C-alpha cells in the first residue's frame, strides 16, 4: 500500500465523454494528474483534464501515464492494445474483448455457468432468422454481434418477421435469444481491486426504453445478484468498477450484459453513497484500498436524453449534472439528475416529477 502523497499517479483515460468527465471530477480530491485520449478537444473530459491527446498520439499518451483506463470499450482499439502490451491497462483487455463481439460474451456466461437467457449463435443473418423460426417460433431477439450498446443493433421480433428480411443480407455472426418476459430489470455496481477484494453497491431497479436507460433507483436488496456479479468478476480476474445488468423473472436472476467500466446505473452514487463509483474505480486501478460501499439514503437518477433545455423547476427535486456537449442528438445523454429521499417511495415520486418536467410530451427515443 502507499500514500497518495508519496505517489502522484498520472492516470490516462481512453475517451472524453461524460464518464471520463466524472472520473476526473471525482479524482480531483487527490493529487492525481489526468490525461485523456480523445478526438474532440471540446469533449467533457478534455475540458477538465490536465492534457488531451489526439488518437494518433496514443503511444505518447500511454507512455506518459502510470495506469490506463477507459470510459467506453468500443473505441481506440490500437490504444487499448498498446496499453495492455505495456502492462498499464485496467480493467484488462480480456473484459474488453468479450464486449467487442456479443456472442463471445454470451458464450462466456455459458462456459462459466452464469445464468443468462437461452440463446444460439448464428453465422449470419439468414441463419439467425432460421434459428428464430425453428427454436423460438418467430418470437425473440436478434442481436448484431458488434457495436451493441444503448439498444443498438438489437431487433425485437414478435411474429412480424417479414419486417426483418433485410437481416438476410448481413454476413456477420449474430446472437439469437429468447424474449424474456421479465418482472423488471435491475443492475449492480461492483468493484474489485488488484488483491481480489470485492465490494458491491446495492442493486437498483432500472427502467429502460428502446435499450437505453431512462431512470433507476434503489436500493433493491437481492443477494443473488451480488453473488452472480462476484462470480463474473472472479472469472475475469477483474480490476475496477463493473456494471452488471440483469432481468428478474419470478425471483430468478438472468444476466443481460455487463459493462467493464463505470456505468450509467451507478451515477446515483455521486450523491447517494459515501464513495462514488468513480472514486472507487480510481482506488481500484491505482492500488488504493477500496472504500466502503455505504449507501447514505435511498436514491436514484434520471437521464436527460436528446435535449439541452430543462425547466428550472427540476432543481427543486434533484441535483443536475450537465455534460455541456456541443451537439444535441436524439437519444444522446446530455446530462442527468440525481435524487435522494428518506425512502424509496419518496425517491420514486421525485423521479416521476422530474420525468414530467423534462419529457412534457413523453419520451421520444
From Swiss-Prot:
It catalyses: 5-amino-1-(5-phospho-beta-D-ribosyl)imidazole + hydrogencarbonate + ATP = 5-carboxyamino-1-(5-phospho-D-ribosyl)imidazole + ADP + phosphate + 2 H(+). Pathway: Purine metabolism; IMP biosynthesis via de novo pathway; 5-amino-1-(5-phospho-D-ribosyl)imidazole-4-carboxylate from 5-amino-1-(5-phospho-D-ribosyl)imidazole (N5-CAIR route): step 1/2. GO terms for molecular function: 5-(carboxyamino)imidazole ribonucleotide synthase activity; ATP binding; metal ion binding; phosphoribosylaminoimidazole carboxylase activity. Gene3D superfamilies: 3.40.50.20, ATP-grasp fold, A domain, ATP-grasp fold, B domain. InterPro entries: ATP-grasp, ATP-grasp_carboxylate-amine, ATP_grasp_subdomain_1, PreATP-grasp_dom_sf, PurK, PurK_C, PurT/PurK_preATP-grasp, Rudment_hybrid_motif. Its EC number is 6.3.4.18. GO terms for biological process: 'de novo' IMP biosynthetic process. ATP binds at residues 102, 143, 148-154, 177-180, 185, 256-257. The keyword Nucleotide-binding applies. It is an enzyme of class 6 (ligase). Keywords: ATP-binding, Ligase, Nucleotide-binding, Purine biosynthesis. It holds the Pfam family RS_preATP-grasp-like. Residues 106-286 form the ATP-grasp domain. HAMAP family: PurK (MF_01928). NCBIfam families: PRK06019.1-5, purK. Belongs to the PurK/PurT family. Homodimer. Catalyzes the ATP-dependent conversion of 5-aminoimidazole ribonucleotide (AIR) and HCO(3)(-) to N5-carboxyaminoimidazole ribonucleotide (N5-CAIR). This is N5-carboxyaminoimidazole ribonucleotide synthase. The gene is purK.
Amino acid at each position: 500500500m502507499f500514500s497518495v502523497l508519496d505517489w502522484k499517479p498520472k492516470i490516462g483515460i481512453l475517451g472524453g465523454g461524460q464518464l471520463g468527465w466524472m472520473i476526473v471530477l471525482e479524482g480531483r480530491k487527490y493529487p492525481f494528474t489526468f490525461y485523456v485520449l480523445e478526438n474532440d478537444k471540446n469533449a467533457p473530459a478534455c475540458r477538465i483534464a490536465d492534457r488531451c491527446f489526439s488518437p494518433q498520439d496514443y503511444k505518447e499518451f500511454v507512455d506518459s501515464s502510470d495506469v490506463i483506463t477507459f470510459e467506453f470499450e468500443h473505441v481506440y482499439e490500437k490504444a487499448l492494445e498498446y496499453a495492455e502490451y505495456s502492462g498499464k491497462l485496467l480493467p484488462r483487455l480480456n473484459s474488453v474483448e468479450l464486449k467487442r463481439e456479443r456472442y463471445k460474451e454470451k458464450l462466456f456466461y455459458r462456459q462459466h455457468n452464469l445464468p443468462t437467457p437461452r440463446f444460439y449463435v448464428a453465422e449470419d443473418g439468414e441463419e439467425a432468422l432460421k434459428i428464430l423460426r425453428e427454436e423460438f417460433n418467430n418470437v425473440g431477439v436478434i442481436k448484431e454481434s458488434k457495436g451493441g450498446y444503448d439498444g443498438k443493433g438489437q431487433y425485437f421480433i414478435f411474429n412480424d418477421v417479414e419486417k426483418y428480411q433485410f437481416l438476410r443480407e448481413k454476413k456477420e455472426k449474430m446472437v439469437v435469444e429468447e424474449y424474456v418476459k421479465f418482472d423488471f430489470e435491475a443492475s449492480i455496481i461492483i468493484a474489485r481491486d488488484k488483491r481480489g477484494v470485492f465490494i458491491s453497491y446495492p442493486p437498483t431497479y432500472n427502467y429502460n426504453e428502446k435499450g437505453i436507460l431512462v431512470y433507476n433507483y434503489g436500493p433493491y436488496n437481492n443477494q443473488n445478484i451480488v453473488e452472480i456479479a462476484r462470480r463474473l468478476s472472479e472469472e475475469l480476474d477483474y480490476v475496477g468498477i463493473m456494471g452488471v445488468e440483469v432481468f428478474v423473472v419470478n425471483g430468478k436472476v438472468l444476466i443481460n450484459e455487463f459493462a467493464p467500466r463505470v456505468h450509467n446505473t451507478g451515477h446515483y452514487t455521486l450523491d447517494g453513497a459515501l464513495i462514488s463509483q468513480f472514486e472507487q474505480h480510481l482506488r481500484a486501478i491505482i492500488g488504493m484500498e477500496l472504500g466502503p460501499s455505504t449507501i447514505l439514503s435511498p436514491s436514484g437518477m434520471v437521464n436527460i436524453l436528446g435535449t439541452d433545455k430543462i425547466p428550472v423547476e427540476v432543481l427543486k427535486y434533484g441535483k443536475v449534472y450537465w455534460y455541456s456537449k456541443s451537439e444535441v442528438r436524439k437519444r444522446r445523454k446530455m446530462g442527468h439528475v440525481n435524487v435522494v429521499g428518506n425512502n424509496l417511495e419518496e425517491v420514486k415520486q421525485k423521479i416521476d416529477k422530474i420525468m414530467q418536467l423534462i419529457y412534457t410530451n413523453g419520451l421520444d427515443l
